[in-house]
């Protein structure tokens, strides 16, 4: 992506075009087994074993990061693979809170589905951002945001005053919204591109 040219063919700051990411996203959606089905559970068991290189029955962050690149190949979608740390931390913390057990430093199989759900959600935010960022400069301006209101509402947002909401996103008052600012806002509102009925609620 870039500031000039079509969004689909231009390059952006992280070296991935919107078209590249869309193709990669369709593949990633298929390889993250987050559904509550017997078939998905079997796939999770197999995936967990591939991540668990030390065969300890629990995953360190290094193992998760390595698995996301070597097994899931998430780096084909975006170099922002570091966001796996957010999914890892949320899953292990929530798993321990829900079950009153688990490790503070590892994700066990009990929390593995939670982690995959969070991972999916974080990467889905990149898809949303690409849809709105029509200039392709990896920043949202007020006009882009206002134009995207119908799409944002389809994803679950409730926006009565686009200008006020944009100011809320633009925390530093720069006049533009970064991916991180958008991600924080969208995550808090649980926006969803594909209407997934099985998202993990924050209060779960």
UniProtKB/Swiss-Prot annotation:
Region Disordered: list its residue ranges: 1-21
Q: Which SMART domains match?
A: EFh
The cross-references to CDD domains, in alphabetical order and at most eight, read: EFh
Task: Report the principal subcellular site.
Answer: other
Q: Where in the cell is it found?
A: Cell projection, Cilium, Flagellum
Q: What is known of its domains?
A: This protein has four EF-hand domains, three of which may be functional calcium-binding sites.
Record family assignment:
Belongs to the calflagin family.
> What protein am I looking at?
Flagellar calcium-binding protein
Lineage runs: Eukaryota, Discoba, Euglenozoa, Kinetoplastea, Metakinetoplastina
């Amino acid at each position: 992506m870039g500031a000039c040219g079509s969004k689909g063919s231009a390059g952006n700051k992280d070296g991935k075009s919107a078209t590249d990411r869309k193709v990669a996203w369709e593949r990633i959606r298929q390889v993250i087994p987050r559904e509550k089905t017997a078939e998905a559970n079997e796939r999770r068991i197999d995936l967990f074993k591939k991540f668990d290189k030390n065969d300890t029955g629990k995953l360190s962050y290094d193992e998760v990061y390595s698995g996301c690149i070597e097994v899931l190949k998430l780096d084909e979608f975006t170099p922002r693979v570091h966001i796996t740390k957010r999914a890892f931390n949320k899953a292990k913390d929530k798993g321990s809170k829900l079950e009153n057990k688990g490790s503070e430093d590892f994700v066990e199989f009990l929390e593995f589905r939670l982690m995959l759900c969070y991972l999916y959600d974080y990467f889905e935010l990149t898809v949303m951002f690409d849809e709105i960022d029509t200039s392709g400069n990896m920043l949202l301006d007020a006009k882009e945001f206002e134009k995207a209101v119908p799409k944002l509402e389809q994803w679950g947002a409730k926006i009565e005053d686009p200008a006020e909401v944009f100011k809320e996103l633009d925390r530093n008052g720069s006049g533009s919204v970064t991916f991180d600012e958008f991600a924080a806002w969208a995550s808090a509102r649980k926006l969803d591109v594909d209407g997934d009925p099985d998202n993990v609620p924050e209060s779960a």
